[in-house]
Amino acid sequence: MAQYKGAASEAGRAMQLMKKREKQREQLEQMKQKIAEENVVKANINKKFSAHYDAVEAELKSSTVGLVTLNDMKAKQEALVKEREKQLAKKEQFKDLQLKLEKQRERERKKEQKRKIASLSFNLEEDEECEDEEADDDYDDEEDDDDEDDDDDDAEKEELPKKKKKLGKNPDVDTSFLPDRDREEEENRLREELRQEWERKQEKIKSEEIEITFSYWDGSGHRRTVKMKKGNSIQQFLQKALEILRKDFSELRSAGVEQLMYIKEDLIIPHHHSFYDFIVTKARGKSGPLFNFDVHEDVRLLSDATVEKDESHAGKVVLRSWYEKNKHIFPASRWEPYDPEKKWDKYTIR
């Protein structure tokens, strides 16, 4: 009798189609889940970018006043975006630094805790002997009670580690190189006292009076003297000299301090320098000391030994307009701007 096989093959095919559809359904669910996760990530990124963009826009609106060109607006916007990115990067660095500091504090706390535990475990030899005697007494009592417990006690005693004796500090060791807060505070206090004392001495020197001899130069010399303090600047000196000279020279009545020049030992001295600067540094010019304080025993070795005289040449007060007209003629042709880095080892008069 023949059998009909068509129904069985169709059933197998239907089963395969069902499995295939189930597999496709699972793949579709996985794809949906993946797409949903990607959308969540993009949404977070968009939120961050939106907050960043809103902050930049707010800063741009607050810093822009009136009408500006498109190029200026773009340049300002780019600068604000870069500044905002720097701020965000600094925040991230600050968070990382905080985490590192917290980890460092945790490690230090654990080290300190271990150190305290180690210091508490320090025992003297006498305490160890007492503990050994007590352990022996306990061992004898237990031996009388039970022989099996005796074996267990012996095994436990063998397992117990021997206590190490700790050495104390050696008082003869030099510890001056170790950090000491009290010693450092004392050194800082002494250093501050010395600094204040030095400043008081310098202020005292600056307040001392000196007599300055100068000559108003208009082709010939007209010598005058004025008293100043060592801490006064050249500009203050010229102001006082101008008040004295205006009485005798009509061309100076309308002149200001900025129109005057001070020439000392063939060097044009800037207005911002003070007499104190030259006294402290013992500055020298082309033809002699700029100021003759504390340079009385200076010796110049030429063909023979000569000792410098006590007094230097009187400084010249000159109108800048006169100098511009006559700077090619002696003595103005010798004058040059003062350079504190330039050294004059030999005096010259030519």
Swiss-Prot record:
Region (Disordered): 1-29, 104-186
Annotated Gene Ontology cellular component terms: nucleus
Keyword line: mRNA processing, mRNA splicing, Nucleus
Record bears the keyword Nucleus: yes
Acidic residues biased stretches: 124-157
Pfam family, any one: XAP5
GO BP term, example: RNA splicing
Cellular location(s): Nucleus
Signal peptide: none
InterPro entries to which the protein is assigned, alphabetical: FAM50A/XAP5_C (IPR048337), XAP5 (IPR007005)
Top-level lineage group: Eukaryota
Family of this protein: Belongs to the FAM50 family.
Function: Probably involved in the regulation of pre-mRNA splicing.
Protein name (Swiss-Prot/TrEMBL): Protein FAM50A
Organism of provenance: Xenopus tropicalis (Western clawed frog)
